[in-house]
């Protein structure tokens, strides 16, 4: 499942909702093929910022470009061909099978009157096997567990074959094995990945760049070793932290 990664540039992004500044002056770049982690406490603006990137919440100011194209100057059809999304929570009321959910990922790429091609179906099957949900193809989406639904949703995003993959807390509901699998997959993909996480150590281990949010602003951005300093983390999360090393060599954060 190979697709070239896109370059994402977020410049001066601001989002106001009902007169409140939810996101303010956020700048960062996700280079092709990078994994960029978005960190921050609850209410720091992570999800709102991501929605502005994938054409769901129009920004009040600033720009979002994918390979030089202003996302908000194009329609949702264009966005769905270039950006795939895994939301924090996926509605479970769909009266569809898991296979049908995954095949929805190919919809942006086909003519409305045509059926999916053999190649499309093969992509969907490969995505389901990759996420270890191939045996759920005929199961009703609403009747499987939350973790299984999350993996099916990620398979749908993979089948979409876009240069930019946005994931909002994709490891929610997943056991340790599948948390690691999702993050390892993010590293292997050639797509550019922007992922919001609460697990700082997962982010430190698997992300090339981190963007740390607090109260709607970006307080630090850069390599994990630069962003994850006790002074910054203690101030943002209001806890005491200690830095060590994971056996992989990544920074490891312990809350004291």
Which positions does each model-derived feature cover?
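The feature captures the beta-strand-to-loop junction immediately N-terminal to the Walker
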Residues: 39-41
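Helix-to-loop junction immediately C-terminal to a conserved catalytic motif
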Residues: 54
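Conserved structural motif at the start of ABC-family nucleotide-binding domains
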Residues: 8-10, 23-25
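ABC ATPase nucleotide-binding domains
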Residues: 234-256
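Conserved ABC transporter NBD signature motif
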Residues: 62-73, 78-79
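Catalytic Walker B motif of ABC-type/P-loop ATPase nucleotide-binding domains
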Residues: 165-169, 174
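Conserved ABC ATPase "signature" region
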Residues: 103, 118-136
